């Protein structure tokens, strides 16, 4: 199970791979279909499975991604499942995001240097790891509570 699902247009694969590499460098696992899927896998099913098991969706919101029916389906599923969604823009202003994602605060990387982009990726990775740690703590407390409750009987 990946921590993050990267939704992107195939035209943006190079940037998606850059993002995935830097997330891995920050100890955050990321599903990226062209890299994460093995030959012979039924990719629509695997993509939906990866999306449903990831808590976060990073949407590489380029003009081509916003026009892609596949990306729209992925984001529709993410919105319905109430995933934590971060639109990342670089080739258009956030104000041009489609209405179905325009109300999410976007990360605007237009004109950012490689070092600035890496710093922003590290910041997002920190949020994801913090969120994951909170979830693990809650799960641990629930298990401990169930164990304590069960041992009283």
Predicted segments, located by residue:
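Juxtamembrane amphipathic/hinge helix adjacent to a transmembrane helix
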Residues: 102-129
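Short glycine-/small-residue-rich Rossmann-like dinucleotide-binding loops
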Residues: 10, 62-63
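Redox-cofactor binding/interface segments in oxidoreductases and associated redox assembly factors
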Residues: 59
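Glycine-rich, charge-decorated loop segments at or immediately adjacent to ligand/cofactor-binding or catalytic sites
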Residues: 93-104
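Conserved beta-strand/loop subsegment of P-loop NTPase cores
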Residues: 85-90
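Conserved TIR/SEFIR loop-to-helix hotspot centered on a Trp-containing motif
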Residues: 63-83
